[in-house]
UniProtKB/Swiss-Prot annotation:
UniProt membrane topology term: Multi-pass membrane protein
Segments on the Cytoplasmic face: 1-25, 111-207, 301-341, 424-443, 539-554
Source species: Oryza sativa subsp. japonica (Rice)
Domain notes: HKT transporters are proposed to contain 4 pore-forming regions enclosed by transmembrane segments with each containing a potassium channel-like selectivity filter motif.
Catalytic reaction equation(s): Na(+)(in) = Na(+)(out)
Gene that encodes the chain: HKT1;5
Protein name: Cation transporter HKT1;5
Length: 554
């Protein structure tokens, strides 16, 4: 018999610890441990796999773990030249980006949410042997303290608050299975109602999980196929990839996964600069940035609506109806219809604003010299779309005017679902009021959290301290603006970087050699470690977006 057989006490103990860890731990700690584990495993595998050729020097361990963290947190901060990695290492980085992508991690969240509802449904089934013949009601399975633990599983963007002391059974309590008749005569729901509610949630959550999985798979397969066909049809683009010793299939799958996950890594040293004269490839890559991040809620709703029309399944329509009323299955990517429309409008306005400023300031710049008007327009649009969260560039950011760089910094700072909502829905106002009436302990901890701007200011100060010697000796490369760009880019998990150039040195160093790495790739060990902390903080920023409420500035 196996030591973990389903009938052994050891299996029961393992199952109990498993449920305690996954269903009672705060999502922040679960996700932090997940990203740390994937980053460490990726580093060990990158170190074990051979480099592209024996002539390529093996990077330092710090640079390899920096690359692993950058891929897992989808930040694309480059510390090692991408063309020095072997095909197996590139495929490993592809896997790290896939595992760290927001859509993929949300699928994992749906899986564990479904498991939680299934466990709750089994736990609330009536036991006739224990209670049916005794005439006694079944013991309550939910206490105020356990209610608080379960509610901590709700995503930070969709907070559900229930007051366990209220005497009236609200709709939320019915949904969560908290209503029950007690000895004081409180009008409550039965165990059967709770079980039915859990069964309904299990069905809809599982359905939503399969829809998102299908969306994820279809986008990747379609993107991979389109890029492979383009490289085969357009000889110039295919020659660029082949000339760098990269397989067309590896390039296609790497680029699609990186772009959809909004990482921004490209298997060429120059990034997408090598393909700025191929607007067709840029137009094929560009939609994946929006499909996997800023417009994911929009296309997810469209996909669900299309599937409902084709299949006629009422459960799909129920998902959209619940979200229209402010409900849903705790999946914060499935926004209400009104919020989705405003999100699409906001994204379009921000892209147009960036496009207009870039064309006005950079149309005749050296970075776009030699391109046709159409190629310049596509390149400008590509930069505008990527500035939010992907970070793929078609020109050297250090050559761009300061006004455009500052605008990019603002865009990198904004969360993906930043929305201009002139009129707030009634259910959103009700949710905000109920959130204010939540537990005092949760409110206190939220208020004690520092705001993202405060944390970023501290990180910038720390990096200015760790790099103070380089700032004094090389003030152009190590300008404060370049440091701010690098930190905000790491926080936004974007990957924009001004790079480092030996030509910009005030005191030329004969031993200096230009490398195709980001600006942070030249930082000290302390600076790189600090930036890795920024990457983790940025990847988990959804848990601290409402921090800093204790400060009152008047």
């Amino acid at each position: 018999m196996s030591s973990l057989d389903a009938t052994t006490p050891r299996y029961d103990e393992f199952k109990r610890i498993y449920h305690l860890f996954l269903f009672h731990a705060h999502p922040f700690w679960l996700q932090l441990l997940y990203f740390l584990f994937i980053s460490l495993l990726g580093f060990l595998m990158l170190k074990a796999l051979p480099m592209k050729t024996s002539m390529v020097p093996r990077p330092m361990d710090l640079d390899l773990i920096f690359t692993s963290v950058s891929a897992t947190t989808v930040s694309s901060m480059v510390a090692v030249e991408m063309e020095s990695f072997s095909n197996s290492q590139l495929l490993l980085i592809t896997l790290l980006m896939l595992l760290g992508g927001e859509v993929f991690t949300s699928i994992l969240g749906l899986y564990f949410t479904n498991a939680k509802y299934s466990s709750k449904m089994i736990a609330t089934l009536p036991d006739d042997d224990d209670h049916g013949g005794s005439g006694k009601p079944p013991p309550p399975t939910t206490s105020p303290s356990s209610t608080l633990v379960e509610l901590e599983l709700a995503p930070p963007m969709d907070v559900v608050v229930v007051n366990p002391t209220t005497t009236a059974t609200t709709h939320d309590e019915v949904e969560l299975g908290l209503g029950r008749r007690n000895k004081r005569g409180c009008t409550c729901t039965t165990t059967h109602t709770s079980s039915s509610s859990s069964a309904s949630k299990t069905t809809t959550t599982r359905l939503l999980m399969f829809v998102v999985m299908g969306y994820h798979a279809v986008v990747h397969v379609a993107g991979y196929t389109a890029i492979v066909v383009y490289l085969s049809a357009v000889g110039g683009a295919g020659a660029v990839v082949a000339g760098k010793g990269i397989s067309a299939h590896t390039f296609a799958i790497f680029t699609v996964v990186s772009t959809f996950a909004n990482c921004g890594f490209v298997p060429t040293n120059e990034g997408m600069v090598s393909f700025r004269s191929f607007p067709g490839l840029l137009l094929l890559v560009m939609p994946h940035v929006l499909l996997g991040n800023t417009l994911f809620p929009v296309f997810l709703r469209l996909a669900i609506a299309a599937l409902e029309r084709v299949t006629g399944w009422p459960e799909l329509g129920e998902l959209l109806i619940r979200r229209r009323r402010g409900g849903g299955e705790g999946y914060h990517h499935l926004l209400p219809s009104s919020r989705t429309r405003f999100l699409a409008l906001t994204v379009a306005v921000l892209v147009v604003a960036q496009l207009a400023l870039f064309c006005a300031m950079e149309w005749g710049s050296d970075g776009l010299r030699g391109l046709t008007a159409g190629q310049k327009l596509v390149g400008a649009l590509f930069m505008a779309v990527n500035s939010r969260h992907s970070g793929e560039m078609v020109l050297d950011l250090s050559t761009v005017s300061s006004a455009v760089v500052v605008l990019y910094v603002v865009m990198m700072y904004l969360p993906p679902y930043t929305t201009f909502v002139p009129v707030q829905d009634k259910h959103q106002q009700t949710g905000a009021q109920s959130g204010q009436e939540g537990s005092s302990s949760s409110s206190i901890w939220q208020k004690l959290l520092m705001s993202p701007l405060s944390c970023l200011a501290i990180f910038i100060v720390v990096i200015c301290i760790t790099e103070r010697r380089q700032i004094a000796d090389d003030p152009i490369n190590y300008s404060v603006l370049n440091i701010v760009v690098e930190v905000i880019s790491a926080y936004g998990n974007v990957g924009f970087s001004t790079g480092y150039s030996c030509a910009r040195q005030v005191r030329p160093d004969g031993s200096c050699r230009d490398l195709w790495v980001g600006f942070s790739g030249k930082w000290s060990k302390q600076g790189k470690l600090t930036l890795m902390a920024v990457m983790f903080y940025g990847r988990l920023k959804k848990f601290s977006l409402h921090g800093g409420q204790a400060w009152k500035i008047e």
